[in-house]
A protein has these predicted regions:
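Extracellular/surface-exposed low-complexity repeats and stalk/linker segments enriched in Gly/Pro
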Residues: 2-44, 61-71
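Short beta-strand segments and strand-loop junctions that repeat across beta-rich extracellular domains
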Residues: 45-58
């Protein structure tokens, strides 16, 4: 077995309400959104990851349990 050295960096996530995550006009969906962007859903206490860069790109809970499509 071989081990690879890695450098862990601090993950800086923005805290956003569930209402804003679901709103395609909210800044979290219209400003600097990209595939792989992480945000903290402060309403439901869960980490979300964007699937794409558009304002209607799906947000997935990182455990894969559910997704939110902004509308």
């Amino acid at each position: 077995m071989s081990l690879t050295q890695v450098s862990w960096q601090f993950i800086n996530t923005v805290s956003v309400t569930a209402t804003d995550i679901a709103d395609k006009t909210a800044p979290v969906n219209t400003t600097n959104k990209y595939a792989g962007l992480f945000v903290w859903d402060s309403t439901n206490h869960r980490l979300m990851r964007s699937e794409g860069a558009t304002n209607v790109s799906v947000w997935w809970v990182v455990d894969g349990s559910t997704s939110i499509t902004p509308s």
